[in-house]
Design a protein with these regions (language model features):
Chain B
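Central hydrophobic cores of alpha-helical transmembrane segments in multi-pass inner-membrane proteins
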Residues: 6-21, 35-48, 89-103, 121-123, ...
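Transmembrane helix-loop-helix hairpins at membrane boundaries of multipass inner-membrane proteins
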Residues: 1-4, 21-116, 192-200, 508-533
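Structural signature of hydrophobic alpha-helical transmembrane segments
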Residues: 1-11, 81-92, 134-147, 209-222, ...
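Alpha-helical multi-pass transmembrane bundles of energy-transducing inner-membrane proteins
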Residues: 25-28, 113-120, 124-208, 293-306, ...
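Predominantly late transmembrane helices and immediately cytosolic-facing juxtamembrane segments
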Residues: 227, 341-344, 413-448
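Alpha-helical transmembrane segments of multipass membrane proteins
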Residues: 16-21, 46, 97-101, 123-127, ...
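C-terminal ends of transmembrane helices
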Residues: 16-27, 96-108, 150-159, 224-238, ...
Length: 488, 536
């Protein structure tokens, strides 16, 4: 029986779905070509869904297959925030290229509804459905401009690898079902089934590792991030990452918290190895990149590593609370920062005469040279984002890293903490290179600069405010994250 | 009065934020605004100086403010000053207007950003000394990197990008491990980042304490900088604009030595005793190595930079002596170095502004052309080499006698080798003076140089006055530092006591063997009776 309270708990999901459908219908019937309302509506829906998530009642839904709690609310707010900001970026970016359509926003809203559901899922099948809702929409978004080689290539790669990950996840889920007779996380926690359960859980984790782009399941990330339209990349880095980590945390905690579970410690150890590999490889490969978009793609792998440190810490008794809240804080901080950074990249991107022209040079670090002179506000914003990604105080990135390493030390994972801080020094080096280019190098000769579209500027400004506010006064977010962690 | 410290701390930051609103084109407005803000900050900080109590009943930390900041992570906004922190805050606020005035004509490009960066930097520096919460300290300590990075990288000379990236990566890399150590402390002191509480209740095994001390010590040693992790310093100093060099030498390096004094030693006193010989030896190597390197430099700024390595070696040597004289001298030498080396960089900057070169060979025989600059240069040089009557003498004398009297192994060797640094210092500094100001004026470009302008006089007079006052009447400064020094000494003594209870064969390590100098005796703080005395 679905009660009013259940509907209230599902309201964010319903709002996003309804918003997406409205968008598609309006695109059919309103053919005036004036599309300003679409981005406005999408932002409005995102804000409404986030607000609904904040007031959503705590309850178990669909006979325990999903749950609405502080954790899901937090993930919903992060996903909706990422959606709102990347819609703003998308509006300006698409309009410049004359390819703005209602479908773009509809797909983004559908994807976000999948993320919201993923944050709530406490059952492997619901999780699978949510992953597919999210992923199918994002595949389409990656190929959205249709013309041009790179988006098509990116979308194709993403689709093939994503299907493979989904298949692994689904196969794992079926093995788990065979072993335990249930797909509920609570059933997994009860354990039983021996090797079959272990194999199933391992496959589920492999599927999720693809989604969060942890090394060695990361190979798709640089190409897809680079090839996808920049606003979509921002959306992927903020939203998809948050949702994938949400389900990873929930599933992993079920695996390690159960009484009869096989090898909870081994699963934690395996994730620890993924974390180390991601931090080291992500940072090392980002180091030589001259293409800023690609550098941010590799850095997103490294950040997945830091997030995994939080997940591993959450798997221990001492680090559980600290780990969960650290992952949430990190997701919020990273989402704000990375959307902002990609927004700046989008603002600098040349509008190519033809989409077949390879825009790779548009993301070269040389585009950033002398930016502090020609566009001081944009350069300052990018500098703030880079410092936040590097984890320098007083930015959101520092608070996020602090809470992640705090969780690692609480869980007595000293090795992870030390490798984490040392690899973050590598990060400082390549993030600083962007600052060096902007502030300390002269601009390229004959470089005409287009002014950024208004909505992109708004998105950048909002992201800067969020990053600095989170860095200076993070108590509100940290308090929410802690409350969410206590209930989970 | 607690509010006053907060005002002094954040006034420069708000000044910087207000400067954002001033129009970009009006360079004069930015200069005047920054000067005004820094002057007001300095005069307000005088209130701290006059209200600080050094009596027997005075609290350890004064002007304290304690508020929750990120409560759910256990981080508080806790600031307060002890005597040493107060002296360093005063040094910072006093150098503020001097630095701004010195940059008046040197900075021509992006004037607005330059002065915003300087004001931002001032808040971060004061915050580093005032913080009493480990994370708050770390935040200020790291926040300094960004404006300094920009100061060197944007307004520096030819090789600035290399120098600034090296500076940033060196100090950032060294301090991240300190963050892990801070987090470890958090989970072993009952769950607080508060420094005062952590110092009280920290429970770690000696083996772990050795690692934690190492993590703190590496971070601070790079900042000091100690041999062999000093290599970022000559590059950063040489490439930085004058204002950057002065701030770097005057205040930033003190954050390393202050870190040892405030954090590494009191938190892990037993581990500090464990590493004492090594750090002392590195300090001596730094003294001699820095002096020898100074001697062979052809670039004035680089010469002064290497002399910093030598001088900071003295500070570290005095600290590792762990005697009242050594610690007091160490604190005093921090101030001296800020004044005299800051002064030297200012003077070198003035010469460079006139001749656009830092090479010593391009100068010679300037004393006739610029008699006032030459006079002041000689005065500051004499202070730097520790001539009696100048401030440098007081610091170096205390450090060397404190080392000689200390209970380190072979203290005589440390003191004797350290003392060679004084002689070498005289050699390289006087030879610099001779090559720049005396001898024949051969380069025709040096024939018509302007002497000290009124603005430059305003910059240099405070420095010269401080050199004289601190040289002839050091007592107010020593008295201010004394309670903090005595407390640290008592803490080290109780650690020694603890070690000797476990292993009675250990000899005494803290304090002096014979009768000490009158300067630092008797203990000013009866509230903390030294355990070593009680046991006798």
């Amino acid at each position: 029986m679905v009660t009013n309270q259940d509907l209230l708990a599902l309201l964010p999901f319903i709002l996003l779905g309804a918003g997406a459908l409205t968008m598609m219908l309006s695109e059919v019937f309103l053919t005036s070509g004036r599309r300003a309302y679409q981005s406005g509506l999408a932002v409005l829906v995102a804000v409404a869904a986030a607000a609904a998530a904040v007031v959503a009642p705590e309850r178990s839904l669909f006979a325990g297959q999903a749950v609405s709690d502080g954790f899901s609310s937090f993930v919903t707010v992060v996903a909706c925030g990422g959606l709102a900001l990347s819609v703003l970026v998308g509006r300006g970016w698409l309009e410049r290229r004359g390819i703005e359509r209602g479908e773009y926003y509809a797909l983004a809203l559908f994807a976000t509804s999948g993320m919201v559901l993923l944050g709530m899922a406490s059952d492997l099948l619901v999780a699978f459905i949510a992953i597919e809702v999210m992923s199918l929409a994002v595949y389409a978004l990656a190929a959205y401009p249709r013309r041009g080689q790179r988006p098509a290539e990116a979308a194709f790669k993403y689709f093939i690898i994503g299907s493979f990950a989904s298949a692994a996840f689904l196969y794992g889920a079926s093995l788990v079902y065979g072993a335990t007779g249930t797909t509920l996380f609570s059933g997994i926690a009860r354990g039983g089934g021996g090797g079959l359960l272990t194999a199933g859980l391992a496959l589920v984790l492999v599927g999720l590792a693809f989604k969060v782009a942890a090394v060695p399941f990361h190979a798709w990330t640089p190409d897809v991030y680079e090839g996808a339209p920049t606003p979509v990349t921002a959306f992927m880095a903020a939203g998809v990452k948050a949702a994938a980590f949400a389900i990873l945390v929930r599933g992993f905690l079920a695996m390690v918290s159960g009484t009869g579970v096989v090898g909870g410690a081994q699963i934690g150890g395996a994730l620890g190895i993924l974390a180390i590999l991601s931090m080291v490889v992500g940072n090392l490969f980002a180091l030589p990149q001259r293409n800023v978009k690609r550098m941010l793609a590799y850095s997103s792998i490294a950040h997945a590593g830091y997030l995994l440190v939080g997940v591993v810490s959450a798997g221990t008794r001492e680090g559980r609370q600290a780990g969960i809240s650290a992952v949430l804080i990190y997701l919020a901080a990273y989402a704000a920062t990375v959307v902002g950074a990609f927004a700046v990249v989008a603002a600098l991107e040349r509008t190519a005469a033809s989409p077949d022209v390879d825009p790779a040079k548009a993301w070269d670090i040389a585009r950033f040279a002398g930016l502090a002179k020609s566009r001081p506000a944009l350069a300052l914003a990018m500098a703030v984002f880079m410092l936040s990604l590097a984890g320098v105080p007083p930015t959101a990135g520092f608070v996020a890293k602090l809470s992640i390493f705090r969780a690692a030390v609480a869980a007595q994972q000293y090795g992870l903490a030390v490798i984490g801080v040392l690899t973050s020094v590598l990060g400082a080096y390549y993030y600083l290179r962007v600052v060096v280019a902007m502030y300390m190098q002269p601009a390229e000769a004959g470089e005409e600069s287009e002014t950024a579209p208004v909505t992109v500027s708004v998105a950048v400004a909002l992201a800067v405010v969020a990053v600095v506010a989170l860095g200076i006064g993070p108590e509100s977010i940290a308090g929410l994250a802690r409350a969410a962690a206590q209930r989970l | 009065m607690a509010i006053l410290l907060n005002v002094v701390l954040f006034l420069p930051l708000f000044g910087a934020l207000a400067a954002v609103l001033l129009p970009r084109g009006e360079a004069a407005q930015h200069k005047s605004w920054a000067l005004l803000v820094s002057l007001v900050t300095f005069f307000l900080s005088l209130g701290l100086w006059f209200n600080f109590e050094t009596g027997r009943t005075a609290a350890e930390f004064q002007f304290e403010t304690h508020l929750p900041w990120i409560a759910s992570l256990g981080i508080g906004y806790h600031v307060g000053l002890d005597g040493v922190a107060l002296l360093l805050v005063m040094l910072t606020t006093a150098l503020g207007p001097i630095v701004i005035l010195s940059a008046w004509n040197e900075v021509q490009e992006r004037v607005k950003e330059f002065f915003i960066a300087i004001l931002f930097l001032e808040t971060a520096m004061i915050g580093t000394f005032a913080a009493l919460d480990l994370v708050l300290f770390y935040v200020f300590y790291e926040a300094i990197l960004v404006p300094m990075y920009l100061l060197i990288g944007v307004w520096g000379s030819e090789n600035r990008v290399y120098a600034t990236v090296k500076f940033f990566v060196y100090t950032f890399a060294a301090s991240v491990l300190m963050l892990v150590a801070i987090l470890y402390v958090y989970f072993h002191d009952g769950g607080t980042f508060d420094y005062v509480a952590a110092r009280q209740s920290l429970q770690v095994t000696p083996a772990v304490a050795v690692w934690l001390f190492a993590a703190f010590a590496v971070a601070f040693a790079v900042k000091v900088p100690m041999f062999p992790v000093h290599t970022w310093l000559p590059d950063a100093h040489t490439e930085a604009p004058t204002a950057g060099s002065v701030i770097l030498a005057g205040v930033l390096l003190k954050m390393g030595t202050f870190g040892f004094f405030r954090y590494a030693l009191p938190l892990f006193p037993e581990a500090a005793l464990h590493y004492r010989g090594l750090i002392g030896a590195l300090a001596v190597v730094g003294i001699i190595y820095g002096a020898l390197m100074s001697f062979v430099q052809t670039d004035m700024k680089r010469l002064v930079a290497y002399s910093s390595v030598s001088h900071l070696g003295f500070v570290m040597l005095g600290m590792m002596a762990i005697t009242a004289e050594g610690l007091t001298g160490s604190v005093y030498q921090m101030l001296n170095h800020g004044v005299s080396t800051g002064g030297l960089f200012l003077l070198v900057g003035m010469l460079k502004e006139r001749r656009h070169t830092r090479l010593i060979a391009d100068y010679g025989g300037l004393a006739r052309q610029v008699p006032w600059i030459a006079t002041i240069f000689v005065v500051v040089t004499l202070s730097s080499i520790g001539l009696p009557g100048t401030n440098g003498f007081v610091g170096e004398f205390l450090i060397l006698s404190g080392t000689w009297l200390s209970r380190m192994k072979a203290p005589g060797w440390y003191a004797a080798l350290g003392a060679t640094g004084v002689i070498l210092g005289a050699v390289y500094m006087l030879s610099l003076v001779q090559r720049v100001f005396f001898g024949k004026l051969e380069n025709p470009e040096n024939r018509h140089l302007q002497d000290l302008t009124l603005r430059e006089a305003f910059v240099m007079v405070p420095i010269v006055v401080l050199i004289g006052v601190m040289g002839l009447g050091p007592n107010p400064f020593l008295q201010t530092a004394r309670p903090a020094v005595d407390r640290l000494l008592a803490r080290m003594q109780s650690a020694e006591q603890h070690l000797r209870q476990q292993d009675p064969s250990l000899r005494e390590m803290v304090g002096t063997e014979g009768p000490a100098l009158a300067l630092a005796r008797p203990p000013a703080v009866p509230a903390l009776p030294s355990p070593a005395e009680g046991s006798r």
